[in-house]
Amino acid sequence: MEFMVSMEEASQVATADQSTDSSSKSTSRIGSEENEILERRTILDSANNQPLLYIFKKRKGFTIVSADLRVMPVLAYSDKSNIDPNHIPNGVTLWLEMAKEKIREAKRDTSPPHPIVLKEWQKFLSRQLRTSDSYCIEWYQYGQYQCKYTSTQKGPLLTSEWSQRHLSTTQLSSGGDCDDCGRRFAGCGPVAMAQLEEFYHPNLARPRFSNGTCFATNAGQVSLGTLMQVMGSKSKASYNYMGTCATFTWPANVKSGLKDFGFSNGGNGNEAYNFALIKSELNGNHPVIFWGSTCLDCFADYHIWLCDGYLQHHYSDFNCTTKQCNQWSYSYLNMNWGWGNDSNGYYAFGQYNPDEGDYNTNLHVITGIRP
């Protein structure tokens, strides 16, 4: 219980301004009206009913905050996207399961929080935390100047926030009124493919958002619906899959579908999660496709989506024993989930503290996509 973060304390984190610059030592970041919390939800550990993390919907954007001091405070955030804390969409649910397991791992370790992590919490919380790192003479002499925080960011690359419904389905046949417009869902695979095509070969007549209206009234809206229909055909999408509203697309068919559409490469064969490779792709202005499910035949939570950016906080903490800087990076990936403006934002991947393992379960990545 010593390291537990209360809902009230997590709210202090959520209402602070999220910034790419984490170097501030101030504990008084003032939340603006846009950071006002509208809804909140506690995600509990099913094993012991203890909090693992908190989800905050704000007047503008959202923040997901850890419930334990042994992992970094901000796990995910956006300053513009919407989130419904009580109805988490596919894709986000996969990340959420991964985040919960990382926090469980940190809680199993009885060690106190790492100094880098604790100092990050101290920037947000009103209570004083006991840091284990007492500064030595070398820190005062040169360590504080030698060990500097930096950050790197790329993206977001996409300008579209398309979904599976409304204008995305105007060229699809009716099928159970799945999209509130009397038509089938476009499918997560075709949405990802269509957004890739729009990124590489933009048609600015197409709307940036597909939600909000059922019928196309101009050439750009018609073009969007047609592109979705073509991508569904190229990827052999199965509409109303197994008698449901789901539209299912195999990842292999996404790759071959992009190639058939005219891309020079629909994606490489190795789909193992590799942050360095993802970062390299994004630095080259190439979004990557993520896909996954909680198990091999768990089709209900299966999803395909795009990653179009990253943000890394590079921490440097002086070690009084070794007289060296301890380096560690905390990494976010920017996700465009293919649900319109729902839940898009930066999500933490890799290590949640410097002592933790780096694993990402049930996630696959398609890299090497080229127009």
Kindly give the residue locations of the regions a language model identified:
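Active-site-adjacent structural segments surrounding the nucleophilic cysteine of cysteine proteases
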Residues: 74-244
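Extracytoplasmic/periplasmic, Sec-exported soluble proteins
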Residues: 6, 57, 180, 184-189, ...
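Short, non-transmembrane alpha-helical segments in secretory-pathway proteins
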Residues: 1-47
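Catalytic cysteine-centered active-site loop
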Residues: 209-218, 244, 260-276
